[in-house]
């Protein structure tokens, strides 16, 4: 796929331009310099044409620290490999020595370049005061745009497409598929894991290519379902440790199951509906929760349950009571043998993965915190100042408090509930908490 790179000195609006062209708020936009450190990329689709767009950090003429130097090196290396560069300058203030230095590097790199004058909301002023000096950079006619106000972006896109097609690049191909969602199917022996695994793979809409596995190892299958890529892992049944002989194949298979959970994004926990929820089911669910993996709970063999039409509430209550520590998981009733509700399992996996990879703004967290603390009594002497999300997979939140010692399990339950009820439900995903002392 053709790659188009956005480059320029800091704070000329590169990330705003990137977000508008990909039609997502993917790159962080702030007024301060150096907000973008790592390259951010996404696919641009425009009238059936597609290309990869990459937003880079601002290139400093003379980096003042090691990080800035490394950022500059990464950007300059990417320029050499790009099919096309969008060289963004400030359409209000004109060019500086930093612009001239970067222009010199671009010319020496012999890379195709489009000169983009951003922040050109006042076109007459731009034409009169800024445009004439831009020709000195050596890239011909500049394209004036205002990313913030969506001015002239169509003209820019037309020019990009034209330049790429002149190079003979294929723009008709579909966007590259992102990394696969890794799904492990786990449970006790004989609960129907392999049957569910096969039911998912046998969907008519699924294109399956096998990844070779080894006997007693987890069996992997790479699957495309509705354009999404998954790797499903069918694992061996997990028995209680006391029932597994040491130094046996089963013992090592259990290690492999745990390893599969570690490598998964989403774990489907399969239960035998004819047997309810056993202690071993609870242990397996606890293992998944402690490893911080997203989860979906499946009551399989639902076709064998007597009077099943009237027993959904009964089994849902059982789930909430015995697997209360993962009660955020979607609950699905299936018969893998008959193909019942396999679609719902796939939908639940997608939901859990979306939650697992969601990041919420700090403003939403602290607004909810302020609102709830107004009518909540914390332990005497405890103060929670503010919080922010610091990671995904799983969603992890850092709260600044005056005393970490006063944070006990009830306070952790309170904060998780606050996040799910007032910020984002994170259905299917655990929430991890961290605390830092602050005054």
UniProtKB/Swiss-Prot annotation:
It comes from the Bacteria. Pfam families: KH_dom-like, MMR_HSR1. Disulfide bonds: none annotated. Residues 358-439 form the KH-like domain. PANTHER family: GTPASE DER. PROSITE patterns: G_ENGA. One of its GO terms (molecular function) is ribosome binding. This is GTPase Der. GO terms for biological process: ribosome biogenesis. Residues 2-168, 181-357 form the EngA-type G domain. GTP 2 binds at residues 187-194, 234-238, 300-303.
